[in-house]
Swiss-Prot record:
CDD domains, sorted: cytochrome_b_C
Record's subcellular location: Plastid, Cyanelle thylakoid membrane
Subunit structure: The 4 large subunits of the cytochrome b6-f complex are cytochrome b6, subunit IV (17 kDa polypeptide, petD), cytochrome f and the Rieske protein, while the 4 small subunits are petG, petL, petM and petN. The complex functions as a dimer.
Protein name per Swiss-Prot or TrEMBL: Cytochrome b6-f complex subunit 4
PANTHER family listed in its UniProt record: CYTOCHROME B
Keyword Electron transport in annotation: yes
Pfam name, any one: Cytochrom_B_C
Family: Belongs to the cytochrome b family. PetD subfamily.
Amino acid sequence: MSILKKPDLNDPELRAKLAKGMGHNYYGEPAWPNDLLYIFPVVILGSIACCGGLAVLDPALIGEPADPFSTPLEILPEWYFFPVFQILRVIPNKLLGVVLMAAVPAGLIAVPFIENVNKFQNPFRRPVASAVFLFGTFVAIWLGIGATFPIDKSLTLGLF
């Protein structure tokens, strides 16, 4: 059964509304004023209230104060830079590491041209794009986890 109720076009009341121009050439409620004036402010204020409530009820600790005279053993970047950091750390030639990082967006740009004969949107019917996505996700996660290990165990994650 469908979630959406299809309109009964034989209903004289609906036909009269559509003849007057209500519906804006589509079925359903207009965005103004129903959504934009009433629902959006409720959602925005609710989101602000949830964030404010969480900030008051469970404040995040700032952590221990920074000590400029003691440097940690290994300085790690933010978590979203872990794969890039791992590439630069493992590849001995830094120019090659930068070229590899530039190859990632170049490869992503090339995917539609490689698979230009396939017009499907379903990922199961687009094997090249799906394979590139799965391989890239696996490599990014592997490199990201490896960045947290010492350099001698970073590529194997200590498994081998």
